């Protein structure tokens, strides 16, 4: 069987697995495979290495086996100069990001500046590093007449001279600046606001000289140095012209000696400013006061809610009636607002059928059915306001020890609502009762040993 036919069954395994599935390869005899790899390295002569074609027999181009020939230098920006000669090139270092005060440069010989702004007669520089190519001039500085600036696709600037129809990498404005700076007399560093034919320096600028005599300018406002004279900037020229036009208007006239009236008039601006400051301060104080009120108001409401209503309105009540009513209210509230707890005969402790969720552990009294009819015929009279009862309920623990013996568990009596069983039990009278009604109730309940029919009317 041919070797090609042995590989056909394994062809489906070469297909990529479906999306979301993984293929796991299991090597049954990995030790033999590893041993074969080691033998192939240790004994290359005995190993069955696959035969490979030599490099010469492969389909490779002829240039693969030949060394590249040195080609003639093409005309490029790196291998050319403005004059066209590329034989005497020397390395030139970029000074665009350097400080002009820390450079050691040779002075540039003066030359004649033509009316078009092009230097016509420059002496050969003493160093190959020309100052004109070491810094950048902003684009807003005007070019000499007849010149135009353009940029290459890579973003580098070059200049076109339409007078003689030539192009150059050198900025013609640098030649103008060097001519102006070199013609200045060599002297120690000049201080700020030097008077030159072009006028004084702007405010914050200072001119200084390097050890070689080159002039540079220091900007004290942003702490920077520049080779460019700020007086050549057209923006500075426009500012100077505007200042010169406004100078006569701004000149103050001679003022007479100040008098009290003129002093008051002269300080009108200060008074207006002071008034505005006071108004702003007043507004800030008002906002701060409102903020403090917003912070204090919740605390004040919380304190008021904690004070009982009886204590707040205690001064307006009649002191004579207060003691009697309070005693009756105590008696009534001790019994959970149920006047039938003091009867003794009808009260009995029943078996509790509650689920145990209630906090109360005492049973509710059962009122006999024959007594309910007589209660409906009684005159209830005027009722005391219900708002006073919850206030007295908070004082249960203070009076429970002084009560006479009843069937109520004093240790477990608390101020929470009782869970009652609806229809079988008489609902407690939550409304407060007057002293007359309480006396009538006690009279009726106390006559248990007498004949009930003499006191009650049955329907």
UniProtKB/Swiss-Prot annotation:
Free-text disruption phenotype from the record: Incomplete epiboly at gastrulation, characterized by blastopore closure defects and impaired axis formation.
Membrane spanning residue stretches: none
Swiss-Prot/TrEMBL GO biological process terms: hippo signaling; positive regulation of transcription by RNA polymerase II
Biased composition (Polar residues): 354-363
Annotated localization: Cytoplasm; Nucleus; Cell junction, Tight junction; Cell membrane
Bias-annotated ranges (Pro residues): 250-260
Keyword set, alphabetical order: Activator, Cell junction, Cell membrane, Coiled coil, Cytoplasm, Membrane, Nucleus, Phosphoprotein, Repeat, Repressor, Tight junction, Transcription, Transcription regulation
Segments forming domain WW: 141-174, 199-232
GO CC aspect terms: bicellular tight junction; cell-cell junction; cytoplasm; nucleus; plasma membrane
Coiled coil: 269-297
Family matches, as Pfam families: TEADIR3 (PF15238), WW (PF00397)
Superkingdom of this protein's organism: Eukaryota
Compositionally biased region (Low complexity): 1-13
Annotated segments matching region Transactivation domain: 261-459
Post-translational modification: Phosphorylated by lats1 and lats2; leading to cytoplasmic translocation and inactivation.
Residue numbers carrying Phosphoserine: 30, 80, 98, 134
Single Gene Ontology MF annotation: transcription corepressor activity
InterPro entries: TEADIR3_omega_loop, WW_dom, WW_dom_sf, YAP1
Family of this protein: Belongs to the YAP1 family.
Self-association state and partner proteins as the record states: Interacts with tead1.
Protein name according to UniProt: Transcriptional coactivator YAP1-A
Organism per entry: Xenopus laevis
């Amino acid at each position: 069987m041919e070797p090609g036919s042995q590989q056909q069954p394994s062809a489906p395994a070469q297909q990529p697995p479906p999306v979301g599935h993984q293929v796991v390869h299991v090597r049954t005899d990995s030790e033999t495979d590893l041993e074969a790899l080691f033998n192939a390295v240790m004994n290359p002569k005995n190993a069955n290495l696959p035969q490979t074609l030599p490099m010469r027999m492969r389909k490779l181009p002829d240039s693969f086996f030949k060394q590249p020939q040195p080609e003639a230098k093409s005309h490029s920006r790196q291998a050319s100069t403005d004059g066209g000669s590329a034989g005497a090139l020397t390395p030139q270092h970029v000074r665009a990001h350097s400080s002009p005060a820390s450079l050691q440069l040779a002075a540039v010989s003066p030359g004649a500046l033509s009316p078009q702004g092009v230097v016509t007669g420059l002496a050969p520089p003493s160093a190959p590093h020309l100052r004109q190519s070491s810094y950048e001039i902003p684009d807003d500085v005007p070019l000499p007449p007849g010149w135009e600036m353009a940029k290459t696709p890579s973003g580098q600037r070059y200049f076109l001279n339409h007078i003689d129809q030539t192009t150059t990498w050198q900025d013609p404005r640098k030649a103008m600046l060097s001519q102006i700076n070199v013609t200045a007399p060599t002297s120690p560093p000049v201080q700020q606001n030097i008077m030159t034919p072009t006028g004084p320096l702007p405010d914050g600028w200072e001119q200084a000289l390097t050890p070689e005599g080159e002039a540079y300018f220091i900007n004290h406002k942003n702490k920077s140095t520049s080779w460019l004279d700020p007086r050549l900037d057209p923006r500075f020229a426009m500012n100077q012209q505007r200042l010169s036009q406004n100078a006569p208007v701004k000149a103050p006239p001679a003022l007479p000696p100040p008098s009290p009236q003129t002093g008051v008039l002269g300080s009108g601006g200060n008074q207006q400013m002071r008034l505005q400051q006071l108004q702003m301060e007043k507004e800030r104080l008002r906002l701060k006061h409102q903020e403090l009120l917003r912070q204090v108001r919740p605390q004040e409401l919380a304190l008021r809610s904690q004070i009982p209503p009886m204590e707040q309105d205690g001064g307006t009540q009649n002191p004579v009636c207060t003691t009697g009513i309070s005693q009756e209210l105590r008696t009534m509230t001790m019994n959970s607002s149920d006047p039938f707890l003091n009867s003794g005969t009808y009260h009995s402790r029943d078996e509790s059928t509650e689920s145990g969720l209630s906090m109360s552990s005492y049973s509710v009294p059962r009122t006999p059915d024959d007594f309910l009819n007589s209660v409906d015929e009684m005159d209830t009279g005027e009722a005391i306001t219900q708002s006073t009862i919850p206030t007295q309920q908070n004082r249960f623990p203070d009076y429970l020890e002084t009560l006479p013996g009843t069937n109520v568990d004093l240790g477990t009596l608390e101020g929470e609502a009782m869970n009652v069983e609806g229809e079988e039990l008489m609902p407690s009278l939550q409304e407060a009762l007057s002293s007359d009604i309480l006396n009538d109730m006690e009279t009726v309940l106390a006559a248990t040993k007498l004949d009930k029919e003499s006191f009650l009317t049955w329907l």
